[in-house]
Amino acid sequence: MSVYAVGLTGGVACGKSLLAQLFEALNTTVVDADTIARQVVEPGPVLNCIVARFGSKILRADGCLDRRFLRQRVFADVAERKALEAIVHPVIRARLKQAAAAAAGPYVLVVIPLLAEAGGRIGYPWLQRILVVDAIPEVQHARLMQRDSIDAEQASLMIAAQIGRKERLAIADDIVFNDGDPAHLGGQVCNLDARYRALASVFSDVD
């Protein structure tokens, strides 16, 4: 792939969306896996496969996916979640790569929430660099409770359902610490943007 691609990941409520917005403000092209995931499950062949596996109860009256119902069904069942991922993840990965390859600009930022779960570059070998946005667990927990209007137990369950912080940080080439200080966060993003532009300027695709 000829474009210089940086993968962005982080735990729930660590600030992936905020970081992506800050990069966009610097005229960086951003491709978001969550956006593509929503497109993938619109009425069509992928949704048909999901219905064949999970039944028509996952559909709303208008024939579209009831995302909340399906999320609740697979959240507490590892086998069900893996079955869903086996259907949608290959399609999402292929479309992510296509979107990244078509991106304009010196480099593209690809937001992938489950990048660590995919093994980092094992799952996404076309990424040249991986950026992890991190927050201390106490801050992450408090943000999640406030953002989703949930109690402490629910927040703990959501965080526990993800890969561990240590494993996520282990795949990072770069780390941004989102401590809640906008100036500090903005400064980190500006420095990284300059670094990525410099790296992209000398990047040569070897595929």
Swiss-Prot record:
Q: Which PROSITE patterns match?
A: DPCK
Question: According to its UniProt record, where is this protein mainly located?
Answer: cytoplasm
* GO cellular component, as recorded: cytoplasm
> Has keyword Kinase?
yes
Name of the top EC class for this enzyme: transferase
Q: Name one GO biological process term.
A: coenzyme A biosynthetic process
Q: Name one Pfam family in it.
A: CoaE
Enumerate the subcellular locations listed in this protein's record, separating them with semicolons: Cytoplasm
The record's keywords, sorted A to Z, are: ATP-binding, Coenzyme A biosynthesis, Cytoplasm, Kinase, Nucleotide-binding, Transferase
Q: Which residues bind ATP?
A: 13-18
- Reaction(s) catalyzed by this protein? 3'-dephospho-CoA + ATP = ADP + CoA + H(+)
EC number(s) per UniProt? Answer: 2.7.1.24
MF terms in GO: ATP binding; dephospho-CoA kinase activity
Question: Residues in domain DPCK?
Answer: 5-203
Q: In which pathway does it act?
A: Cofactor biosynthesis; coenzyme A biosynthesis; CoA from (R)-pantothenate: step 5/5
Q: InterPro entries given for it?
A: Depp_CoAkinase, P-loop_NTPase
Family listed: Belongs to the CoaE family.
Q: What does this protein do?
A: Catalyzes the phosphorylation of the 3'-hydroxyl group of dephosphocoenzyme A to form coenzyme A.
Q: What's this protein's name?
A: Dephospho-CoA kinase
What species does this protein belong to? Xylella fastidiosa (strain Temecula1 / ATCC 700964)
